[in-house]
């Protein structure tokens, strides 16, 4: 299924029912007092996260959501029935934004998370509330309040532990196929990946993590070149980034206005510049360098090229030389990633215990 990760919807809560003007009409009580009941409250609109939903595609067909209006009050102090709430189901990882204010209303990161996005109006008061010593037969009641209305933007941010960065054709999709059961499209031309892909990497029994492959970046992506940076939001929740670089000398032309024959070190610098322009927080995440396509060179040449790239960059974080296509060197990376997460959990536990 095609991933749709943005949608705009209009939500409208139900109005409250009106209060009733009524009087007791019983035998032998000719001057019965007021008995008009209150109107029912309008229904509210809720957004609920469901782990069984994977995309926002349904919102391309239905963009308006209304809750039920409250019923009017009636005589004999009968209250109107409250309107039914409207429930909107979204994938886990959805961020809800108020379009008018650009404020983030909520971030639904767990199955079953609920968010009130439009509150129903209160019911109006019946005339029984307006009886006084000077007004024994009030003909006054109030109308119900209007329900809230909001224009909302829904943004889906995939929940992945590891994110893959790199130029188009760096081999990100090949790597995710090699280490997980995901089957993204793989071909020898740029921008094969048009939408994010998720894969689950199992290192040992009951020990796994989720890895995300997003479309590649090129120079000028922050200005919309190539596929732009619209998919980078899916890397914001990751705990580790793997930066893939094609070290083979036969570099292709990466799209109109793209890069022709850029050195591997300059590929890394270009991605870093685009991240700095679009989302500097991503640069603060732990990032490991994965030098891919070693199978296109002799082993000694590949090792020498990798060491030269690392030296040119002054790279101090972990780095790896792999062939994603041949799966050479991919499993050690995944083992190291799992060990990295284990250390993170231990550090977090120690910090909580110390506090």
From Swiss-Prot:
Start and end residues of each OBG-type G domain: 160-342
Subcellular location: Cytoplasm
Binding site for GTP: 166-173, 191-195, 213-216, 292-295, 323-325
GO molecular function annotation: GTP binding; GTPase activity; magnesium ion binding
Annotated Mg(2+) binding sites: 173, 193
Swiss-Prot/TrEMBL cofactor(s): Mg(2+)
Domain (Obg) ranges: 1-159
A biological-process GO annotation: ribosome biogenesis
PROSITE patterns on file: G_OBG, GTP1_OBG, OBG
Keywords for the protein's UniProt record, in alphabetical order: Cytoplasm, GTP-binding, Hydrolase, Magnesium, Metal-binding, Nucleotide-binding
GO cellular component: cytoplasm
EC number of the protein: 3.6.5.-
Alphabetical list of CDD domains matching this protein: Obg
Summary of the function given for this chain in its UniProt record: An essential GTPase which binds GTP, GDP and possibly (p)ppGpp with moderate affinity, with high nucleotide exchange rates and a fairly low GTP hydrolysis rate. Plays a role in control of the cell cycle, stress response, ribosome biogenesis and in those bacteria that undergo differentiation, in morphogenesis control.
PANTHER family, per the entry: DEVELOPMENTALLY REGULATED GTP-BINDING PROTEIN-RELATED, MITOCHONDRIAL RIBOSOME-ASSOCIATED GTPASE 2
Family: Belongs to the TRAFAC class OBG-HflX-like GTPase superfamily. OBG GTPase family.
Quaternary structure and interacting proteins, as annotated: Monomer.
Protein's name in the database: GTPase Obg
